[in-house]
Amino acid sequence: MKKVLAGIVILLLNGCAMDPDLAPSDIEKATTTVDAVEGSTEQDSGLIDMLRRREDPQAGDPAWNPIRPQAKPEHYATATGSLFSSIQAQDLYDDTKPRGIGDIVTVMLEEKTQAKKSASSDLDKSTDLSMDPLVLGGKPLTIGDRDLSYEVANANKFSGTTSADQSNSIKGSISVEVIDVLANGNLMIRGEKWLTLNTGDEYIRVSGTIRPDDISQENTIESTRITNARIQYSGTGNRQDVQEQGWLANFFNVSL
């Protein structure tokens, strides 16, 4: 009896493992452990990448693939049996703003930030102690050939200053796709642009959440209206590497 029960349990477990509903979807298979903007967070085992402590993003990353809406057959019926679909329907006097997955919107990059910080600290401390020679009977009191007097002086001074001034600006445009529609109607967007130059590649990546009401009639939206925005403009290759300190220079520049 125990053998029969054990066999039934094994068959049930095998059936669950073969259930197509539990199998990973095509989207999960194509998804990599890639950050939304900065690229792969997995370190390469190569010596160069280990010393650089970073890995360049790559064009054609599956995590940044274009979103392709599912194609509908030429003749189809909705769940209600009607040919009319309220999701795809558009009013006669309605605008053509993006509202669905795969729609395109142009982001106008207008970012400018500036930060300044300065601090200073001064510490000054001094101590002076002295005692005149003791006089006893009109004569200085001595021990041997030394009189009983002392003089002590101590001074301690510290001064430290620090300042930081950082500013950046970016101006341009990039077209991105709607990758998800939230329950409140907000749109999640994502997109990238790669430029191949003579000495390397440059890329722009943008992701975040926008409101359809903020999209203009020209199908554009300002980057300052993107919430949870992640904007990256950088490059790859040797030209980018020379702008960063090497691992040995960083080692000697550590503050002790």
From Swiss-Prot:
This is Flagellar L-ring protein. Keywords: Bacterial flagellum, Cell outer membrane, Lipoprotein, Membrane, Palmitate, Signal. The lineage of its organism: Bacteria, Pseudomonadati, Pseudomonadota, Gammaproteobacteria, Vibrionales. Residues 1-15 form the signal peptide. Belongs to the FlgH family. Its main location: membrane. It is a lipid-anchor. InterPro entries: Flag_Lring (IPR000527). Pfam families: FlgH (PF02107). One of its GO terms (molecular function) is cytoskeletal motor activity.
